[in-house]
Amino acid sequence: MHRVSLQAAYVLHSRPYRESSYIVDLITEADGKASAVLKGGGRRKGVPGTLQPFTELEVELGGRGELKSLIRYETTNIRYPLAGAALYAGLYLNELLVKLLQPLEGCRKVFDAYKSSLTFLSLPQPNLEPGIRELEFALLNELGFGVDFCVESATGDIVKNNIAYYFSLTEGVSRTPEPCSVVIEGHHLIAIAGRDWSVPGSLSAAKRLTRRCLDELLGGRPLHSRELMRSYLKLTKG
């Protein structure tokens, strides 16, 4: 990519770079995850308020290498006001994308799922789990681990309600346990496939499944946002 026109984007993370610049990690509509240098302004001023997470932007990136230049940016005035547990859930989603997406590989479905997740999280009384799971499953699909949860991966047999199955990144849905596999009941797999979170226990089962898969892909790298969420929940519960 040499230079593209304005495209929708969200800030995932920013960090100081050299004496008076910042590197801003973005999830963009056209180019996927991109890192760009924001020049000038000085450390004392920090990153401009419009370049904060959970604010929809239009950005123009330039440069030939993997590290781009942030040539132009403007807000669309769409902001997702996350607070409390929803804020830490949003930081978790941002950290996942920073650590697992490859740079400059278009991933429109992940971008759309991210927007949808922010909508879930910004509701007045948000149900965090559906919003989190939506982005996690889109990310797994993007990374090449999308699975039809309604069929056994090796045999093609239809998943049955009353049978316990094993799921792993390498083997998908199976009746045979594998290293790092997680046990999921058949009716929960069917609910997960249809994103039918009204089925009791389906969200909990989906969380166990995505947690195991994402931890394996992270390869032992910690997620700081998880620790922040634990600390917050511990504090609020007294």
Curated annotation (Swiss-Prot):
HAMAP family from the UniProt entry: RecO (MF_00201)
Pfam families according to UniProt: RecO_C, RecO_N
One GO BP: DNA recombination
Highest taxon listed in the record's lineage: Bacteria
Role played: Involved in DNA repair and RecF pathway recombination.
Family that this chain belongs to: Belongs to the RecO family.
Key words of the record: DNA damage, DNA recombination, DNA repair
SUPFAM superfamilies the record matches: Nucleic acid-binding proteins (SSF50249)
Name of the protein in question: DNA repair protein RecO
Keyword Signal: no
A GO CC annotation given for this chain: bacterial nucleoid
